[in-house]
């Protein structure tokens, strides 16, 4: 066997073993392993191995992007029944943005599995954020095609959703949503908002709101609208609760 073919066969055996270990790590075995390998195949690798039947991960990335948006949207819709469309959109955007996807990919050492061309490898492509984010989306696409939405949901439940529950993305929420998140995390009880006072002329109204947790006052706030007053009350409550932590 010519040395080059021997070297390529050895490399192929090595990455197939790596994918086997990866599947054991995540507790998922692909029915069609070709989909898994394709998810980690960068276009630069395909360009340098034209005689091999490899496909790059770009189409899977396209699909995975849509699947990820759908599943994260469904999770947020169920978890935050009172959150507005605008707030849900902001939170979803923070979860599926490039830095977040890179974080998820790095947690599972995706970079070490990517099949790269020599040029891309030499320029540090394995650690390039955009590449890692694309691979994560491609993996979601491959998982969806191989095993369906339920398995994708189970995977995200282990890797992505816990970070939402831990408050990793609360910085993009409004004060009321942040307060709700904090209370849900601690399992402390029910939050209620009350308008205590309305004052001033009709064209310049001021509202005073109080937020309570299990009938215990947490914060007061005022604003030009009921919504603004409630936000300010939630901000004060958040400040107090965080000081106690």
UniProtKB/Swiss-Prot annotation:
CDD domains: DSRM_RNAse_III_family, RIBOc
Catalytic activity from the UniProt record: Endonucleolytic cleavage to 5'-phosphomonoester
InterPro entries: dsRBD_dom, RNase_III, RNase_III_dom, RNase_III_sf
PROSITE patterns to which the protein is assigned, alphabetical: DS_RBD, RNASE_3_1, RNASE_3_2
Location(s), subcellular: Cytoplasm
Domain DRBM per the UniProt entry, residue ranges: 174-243
Record keywords: Cytoplasm, Endonuclease, Hydrolase, Magnesium, Metal-binding, mRNA processing, Nuclease, RNA-binding, rRNA processing, rRNA-binding, tRNA processing
SUPFAM superfamilies: dsRNA-binding domain-like, RNase III domain-like
Known function: Digests double-stranded RNA. Involved in the processing of primary rRNA transcript to yield the immediate precursors to the large and small rRNAs (23S and 16S). Processes some mRNAs, and tRNAs when they are encoded in the rRNA operon. Processes pre-crRNA and tracrRNA of type II CRISPR loci if present in the organism.
NCBIfam families membership: RNaseIII
Complex formation: Homodimer.
Name of the protein in its database record: Ribonuclease 3
Organism: Bacillus cereus (strain ZK / E33L)
């Amino acid at each position: 066997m010519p040395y080059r073919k021997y070297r390529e066969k050895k490399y192929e055996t090595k990455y197939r073993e790596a994918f086997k270990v990866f599947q054991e790590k995540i507790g998922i075995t692909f029915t069609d392993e070709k989909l898994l390998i394709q998810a980690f195949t960068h276009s630069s690798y395909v360009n340098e191995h034209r005689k091999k039947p490899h496909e790059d991960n770009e189409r899977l990335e396209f699909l995975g992007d849509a699947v990820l948006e759908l599943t994260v949207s469904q999770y947020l819709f169920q978890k935050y029944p009172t959150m507005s469309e605008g707030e849900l959109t902001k939170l979803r955007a923070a979860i599926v943005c490039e830095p977040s996807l890179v974080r998820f990919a790095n947690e599972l050492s995706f970079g070490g599995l990517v099949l790269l061309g020599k040029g891309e490898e030499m320029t540090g492509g394995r650690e390039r954020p955009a590449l890692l984010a694309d691979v994560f989306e491609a993996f979601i696409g491959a998982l969806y095609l191989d095993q369906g939405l339920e398995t994708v949901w189970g995977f995200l439940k282990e890797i992505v959703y816990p970070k939402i529950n831990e408050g990793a993305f609360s910085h993009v929420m409004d004060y009321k949503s942040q307060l709700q998140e904090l209370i849900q995390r601690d399992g402390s009880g029910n939050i209620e908002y009350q308008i205590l006072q309305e004052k001033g002329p009709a064209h310049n109204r001021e509202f005073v709101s109080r937020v309570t947790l299990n009938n215990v006052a947490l914060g007061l706030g005022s604003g030009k609208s009921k919504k603004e007053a409630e936000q300010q009350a939630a901000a004060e409550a958040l400040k107090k609760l965080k000081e106690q932590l």
